[in-house]
Regions:
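Auxiliary alpha/beta "docking" domains used to position bulky ligands
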Residues: 2-196, 224, 243
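Iron-sulfur cluster-binding cysteine motifs and their immediate structural context
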Residues: 38, 201-223, 227-243
């Protein structure tokens, strides 16, 4: 769901549509929700990726794997992941603070409409690049896009220059038939990577070190990881340049 889809909020029930409307009202650019589960396929992929040493010196990725693959072990009692996206802005401000500020505002609205018990009172449940959680994969689970050949989340209309943030809540969410269940964009997002990116390899060709080796990313070669900030694989992406 994006800002253009905001509808009037009245007689709120805990549906994905109402949650997303609240997220858009507080200032996010897109929102989706997904039921908590263990991401078995991603766990298998990550374990193999780490075993090959492709994570470089990011040893933290090899820790807390149970929590990383299943948010219910990170926040006991969590049943739903709310994922929000904020557009990238080149202002120099710390996006973590901006995203978390909006998440806390959204949390207050959720408590107001659905009760204090909607979130854990004893465990941290708001995240923005701050916990062992597979953020990009949960964006996909929530219907907010797909993982492109540049290994970034790509939203079908916002592109990949977005910052994700999450709230884990303790209640199940009623799926909306009008939004295709939990995955609002499911009809607009193609079903496989070949359809997503087709024959486009611009990001792979733009990478100055060859770090993008489909279907894996080699952090040891990535300029953004080894030396300095780099967005070459994103700025070249047609989803970020729709014209």
């Amino acid at each position: 769901m994006c800002k253009d889809d905001i509808s009037t909020l009245s007689n709120l029930t805990l549906t994905s549509e109402n949650i997303c409307n609240l997220a858009l009202e507080v200032g996010f650019d897109a929102c989706g929700v997904a039921p908590v589960r263990r991401l078995n396929d991603d766990a298998q992929f990550m374990d193999h990726w780490i075993a090959q040493g492709l994570h470089g010196e990011m040893d933290y990725l090899a820790r807390n794997c149970d929590k990383r693959y299943n948010p219910a072990t990170l926040v006991p009692g969590a049943q739903t992941v709310i994922v929000c996206l904020l557009r990238f802005e080149n202002s120099g401000r710390d996006y973590h603070r901006r995203v978390k500020s909006l998440l806390y505002t959204l949390e207050a609205k959720l408590k107001e409409h659905f009760g204090e018990d909607i979130v854990s009172a004893t465990h941290q449940h708001i995240f923005c690049d701050s916990a062992p959680i597979l953020e990009r994969r949960w964006c996909v689970e929530a219907g907010l896009g797909f993982i492109g050949k540049n290994h970034q989340l790509i939203h079908p209309t916002l592109g990949s220059l977005v910052h994700p943030g999450e709230i884990l809540i303790n209640l199940p969410v009623v799926a909306d038939t009008t939004t295709g269940g939990y995955r609002e964009d499911i009809e607009r997002i193609p079903k496989n990577l070949a359809t997503y990116c087709s024959n486009c390899n611009l990001c792979m060709e733009a990478c100055p070190t060859g770090a993008l080796r489909n279907p894996v990313w080699d952090a040891r070669l990535c300029v953004a990881y080894t030396t300095h900030h780099c967005l070459d694989c994103q700025t070249i992406c047609p989803f970020n340049n729709p014209s």
